[in-house]
UniProtKB/Swiss-Prot annotation:
Protein name: Large ribosomal subunit protein uL22
Chain's gene name: rplV
Biological classification of the source: Bacteria, Pseudomonadati, Pseudomonadota, Alphaproteobacteria, Hyphomicrobiales
Pfam families linked to this entry: Ribosomal_L22
Coiled coil: none
Family: Belongs to the universal ribosomal protein uL22 family.
Organism: Nitrobacter hamburgensis (strain DSM 10229 / NCIMB 13809 / X14)
Amino acid sequence: MSKPKRERSLPENEAKAIARMLRVSPQKLNLVAQLIRGRKASAALADLQFSRKRIAGDVKKCLESAIANAENNHDLDVDELVVAQAFVGNGMVMKRFAPRGRGRSGRIYKPFSQLTIVVRQVEAEASA
């Protein structure tokens, strides 16, 4: 009486990694995600290595996890991996209060984000 096993949502030539609870706004995280979208995995890692954005280290860690998932769990060739998707979602928002003038208080929003990276193995083109 158990539920039927759920089919794999990704094709056989793809692997993914998800980073949750990243303490940065989704808008700022999306700036870094745009850098790696559609790039080869090795080039994307190099871009993140030398990026000056604070969140680039967490994005690099998530990309390395996706590459490791592709290699270890799905037996894909690391040299042929391309970042197929890199998308950002909203996380929770912590609300804090800061004192303002005349005994009032103002809200401060501290947003969190989620990052999903999907890598795909592409076949190397035959050079003519």
